[in-house]
Amino acid sequence: MQVTETLNEGLKREIKVVVPAGDLEAKLAERLETARGRARINGFRPGKVPTAHLRKMYGKSFMAEIVNEILNDSSRSILAERNEKSATQPEVIMSEDEKEAEKVLDGKADFVFSLNYEVLPAIEVKDFSKIAVTREVVDISDEEVDEQVKRIASSTRTFETKKGKAENEDRVTIDYLGKLDGEPFEGGADNDAQLVLGSGQFIPGFEEQLIGLKAGDEKVITVTFPAEYGAAHLAGKEATFDIKVKEVAKPNELVLDDETAKKLGIESLERLRQVVREQIESQYGQITRQKVKRQILDALDGDYQFETPQKLVDAEFNNIWQQINFDLQQAGRTFEDEETTEEAAREEYRKLAERRVRLGLVLSEIGEKAGVEVTEEELQRAVYDQVRRYPGQEKEIYDFLRRTPDAVANLRAPIFEEKVVDHLLANINVTDKKVSKEELTAEDEDAASEAKPAKKAAAKKKAAPKKKAEEGKSEEA
């Protein structure tokens, strides 16, 4: 096999490979001889089938197998010999001339093909011990825990039918029918809907107009759907709702004790408080980690500038762009609504894709040099978590992952990345800073800009006045 480099520009490589017809013939002769000893053909004794007869019957199919084996093995062997790592699977380019292909299969012509690929750039890991980040820390007060406990426990609160007008925190049972320009709209009606006034369960302006109504009252209310509403056909529109109040119920006193905790599946009130505190700590911890991780990535972004494989960037950009357009479509928005143009958005997200690829390569190199590995247990846990996300389809998802190496690699990658971040955190300068929960949860402008408009679209409310109905309508948008 003759290997010749025909292109070496930046990360791009093109390798011409020539497998002489004589080499192909030698491989075919070896395969025919092996088959001769095993072949069972009518009219011939076992092991006595003439090679010429086997060649006539199986020569082309055997040669096709040989060619495929060469193609499958050549990429790996050539890259290994050249001490190169391909960013993606090398592209194989062969002659499309059918006559030429027939000559190769007949053993009368050399097999010639080319491998096109981009190599992974050589990255020299720099000293990262001088990277300094600030880790924001929030002290969780007992008052915050108690407030959250009350919010959770409110689901166990009972209500008692009352006479008189509905007040804030009362529960009303209503029938409603929504109309646009006097015509009912899909998803805008329900019977025996229960709503706790002041809960924010319905769209803004809806609940307030029910205060003061009594059982048996009927009223037509007018609301305006938010301009950034999830359903485009309702966004910014004025609608009316025919309301019939069927019951008004006042809340009984909310008692926080062990019995209330048990109704929530927790053995005691003290354990409930502990669980809630752990949940709050976890939520704040995730936000803190994301902010610290961004600081690390920004520092690495400044330290490492190199050419990135364009096919990797293309793939990353396509993933981002697909999600952006999906989110915009779901929200009924356009690039103009987001105060940009498609061209400008493409340029912005192309830069983001390049940054992600470059930082991914840097983290990969740092992790490899540090000996970071994803254990089988960690990978199995990720597989289990992924399967669990699809109730009723567990077997299908598991089988898909088992037979799709790329899907498993996609599960491995984020685990590896987080372990590399852990390695960096253990070796850089980290300064803790006490902040309020408002400061911690304040949206970072740079992070938000990366998500725009996907982040904005995802934050929109769905269609219909009730959250349950909103979820159903979101699938149509």
Swiss-Prot record:
InterPro entries: PPIase_dom_sf (IPR046357), PPIase_FKBP_dom (IPR001179), Trig_fac (IPR005215), Trigger_fac_C (IPR008880), Trigger_fac_C_sf (IPR037041), Trigger_fac_ribosome-bd_bac (IPR008881), Trigger_fac_ribosome-bd_sf (IPR036611), Trigger_fact/SurA_dom_sf (IPR027304). GO terms for biological process: 'de novo' cotranslational protein folding; cell division; chaperone-mediated protein folding; protein transport; protein unfolding. Involved in protein export. Acts as a chaperone by maintaining the newly synthesized protein in an open conformation. Functions as a peptidyl-prolyl cis-trans isomerase. Residues 435-477 are annotated as: Disordered. GO terms for molecular function: peptidyl-prolyl cis-trans isomerase activity; protein folding chaperone; ribosome binding. The keyword Mitochondrion does not apply. The keyword Coiled coil does not apply. It is an enzyme of class 5 (isomerase). Signal peptide: none annotated. SUPFAM superfamilies: FKBP-like (SSF54534), Triger factor/SurA peptide-binding domain-like (SSF109998), Trigger factor ribosome-binding domain (SSF102735). Residues 454-466 have a biased composition (Basic residues). GO terms for cellular component: cytoplasm. This is Trigger factor. It comes from Brucella melitensis biotype 1 (strain ATCC 23456 / CCUG 17765 / NCTC 10094 / 16M). The gene is tig. Belongs to the FKBP-type PPIase family. Tig subfamily. Residues 169-254 form the PPIase FKBP-type domain. Keywords: Cell cycle, Cell division, Chaperone, Cytoplasm, Isomerase, Rotamase.
